[in-house]
Amino acid sequence: LVLREDFESQTFPPSGWVVKGTELSEDLESGYAHWSLNWNEVTGCSIAGSGCAEVMSDFKEGQAGISKEEWLITPAVQVADNASLSFTFWCNASSFMTNKYGSFLVKVSTDDGDTWSDLWNAASQEDIENSGLTWPWNKDAMGIENNWQKLTPNVSLEAYVGKTVKIAFYFR
């Protein structure tokens, strides 16, 4: 195990992690904003414990063309033989995929975050199936009552063995 983070600390982001994002105008960021998209430590998550990192897009009509990026970046880690990345998250996949409200990707950098390559894309059938999840992303295919589903993809890091990498959880 190279890195484990459960987001249970009162400090967010955790030591060594980086949060960055696009700031919108004050009228869109606060109060009656049409978009709410930030990484925050929240309580009441049902993954495990009381803390989690959350990124949420609250899409409403009338704000076409808004582009906001949010990043949660791990500290640099050395990738060992047979390493894989496993993370658990909740996703309203039916709404997310059907309405194209956003993009959720996991990215990797081998140059301390100067450049990023896609490692896993929530909109890619190949990435989803290769990580052990079910495609298509909708409540009927997933056999769930509501649209929220707890997911734990497993992504190979074989291409990065012996390298020092940073992993980014990216939402736009």
Task: Annotate each PLM feature.
Residues 1-68, 123-149:
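Extracellular glycan-recognition surfaces and repeat-rich motifs
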